[in-house]
Design a protein with these regions (language model features):
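A short helix->beta-strand "capping" segment at the edge of beta-propeller domains
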Residues: 1-19
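Structural motif
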Residues: 41-44, 87-93, 140-144, 199-204
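Beta-rich, blade/repeat-based domains predominating
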Residues: 14-29, 61-86, 114-132, 138, ...
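Short loop/turn segments immediately following the C-termini of beta-strands
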Residues: 37, 81-84, 136-138, 146, ...
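Beta-propeller domains
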Residues: 33-58
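Short loop/turn segments immediately following beta-strands, especially the blade-tip
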Residues: 46-50, 95-103, 144-151, 202-211
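Hydrophobic alpha-helical segments and helix pairs
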Residues: 100-159
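Beta-propeller fold detector
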Residues: 10-13, 53-61, 103-113, 152-163, ...
Length: 226
């Protein structure tokens, strides 16, 4: 039998019982932003040292559930927040962490309230400078043109497909359809998972328009993707 070397796993930080940690983003200094979805909180875990675990620092409490953080420029993040269970209202915030200290209060800038259809949010990724893609928790991907000196942030539906739909009653607890997404800049494909359908798909992206260039393509599927 072939022996597979096991990775060493260490506890970096601990959160209280009942916290649902949804996502993370590593800052340039090695510290880690962590979203506690069910508490509407964003935390910063100091860069790990030899003395583990380290103590997390609360960064901000949002009005909605905190879901995802994407870095656009060094230490500048776009944070998505949603009411995923009732109103499906969704917001996008700009969070400038440059020069931030643990004892310093920080106020995220609300740059966008997502328009209809209100679907809630889940994963998000940077497609190119100035363009963010955010996954609706039902069956669509938003394109967000980020703000610049001349224009405010704008959102529109980038892609919608049946393989992104959730299947009510298919799994307990209920699982989303479209979930995570990542853009592979080297190959020009956007990859996404559809949790309730046990699918991993990809879409070719036009390098000039940053729009979908063809229909979604099957990558993998099965119970392990649930």
């Amino acid at each position: 039998m072939v022996e597979i070397p096991q990775a060493k796993i260490e506890v970096v930080a601990e959160f209280p019982k009942g916290y649902f940690l949804e996502n993370l983003a590593v800052r340039p200094d090695g510290s880690i932003l962590v979203s506690a979805m069910n508490k509407r909180e964003l935390w910063c875990v100091p860069a790990p040292t030899q003395n583990l675990p380290v103590k997390p620092v609360l960064v901000h409490i949002f009005d909605l559930m905190v879901l995802n953080m994407v870095e656009d420029g060094e230490d500048v993040f776009y944070v998505t927040a949603s009411d995923v269970y009732t109103t499906r209202e969704s917001h996008l915030y700009r969070l400038d962490m440059r020069g931030w200290l643990a004892e310093k209060k920080i106020e995220p800038e609300l740059i966008l309230v997502f328009p209809e259809p209100k679907v809630g949010l889940n994963g998000s990724c940077l497609l190119a400078p100035g363009v963010l893609l955010a996954a609706g928790i039902t069956a669509l991907i938003w394109r967000v043109d980020l703000p610049n000196a001349a224009e405010s942030a704008r959102a529109r539906v980038w892609l919608k497909h049946d393989n992104m739909l959730n299947r009510p009653g298919g799994k307990k607890p209920e699982q989303p359809g479209l979930n995570g997404l990542r853009f592979a800049a080297r190959t020009g494909f956007l990859y996404y998972t559809s949790t309730s359908q046990n699918l991993m798909m990809r879409v070719p992206v036009n390098p000039n328009t940053l729009e979908p260039e063809d229909m979604p393509q099957f990558v993998a599927g099965g119970s392990l993707l649930g």
